[in-house]
């Protein structure tokens, strides 16, 4: 059986941690930042975890992760 393909967009957006949780980047921090407060932008720094409801669908997009 041939190898399964991973979704390219999912490869760029998600990474699987050692414990099995999936890491994602924060949204709303690319542009239109002038109207956002410094506190708001500070809270958008770093990464976040994917919700439990979405883990199954993301794992199917990344078969070898």
Curated annotation (Swiss-Prot):
Domain of life (superkingdom): Bacteria
Classification via Pfam families: Ribosomal_L35p (PF01632)
Region described as Disordered: spans on this chain: 1-21
Keywords: Ribonucleoprotein, Ribosomal protein
RNA-binding is among the record's keywords: no
Signal peptide coordinates: none
InterPro entries xref list: Ribosomal_bL35 (IPR001706), Ribosomal_bL35-like (IPR021137), Ribosomal_bL35_sf (IPR037229)
GO CC terms in record: cytosolic large ribosomal subunit
Family: Belongs to the bacterial ribosomal protein bL35 family.
Protein name: Large ribosomal subunit protein bL35
């Amino acid at each position: 059986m041939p190898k399964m393909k991973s979704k390219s967009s999912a490869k760029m957006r998600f990474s699987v941690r050692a414990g099995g949780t999936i890491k994602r980047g924060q949204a709303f921090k690319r542009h239109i930042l002038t109207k956002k407060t410094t506190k708001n932008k500070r809270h958008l720094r770093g990464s976040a975890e994917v919700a439990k409801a979405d883990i199954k669908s993301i794992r199917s997009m990344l078969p070898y992760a």
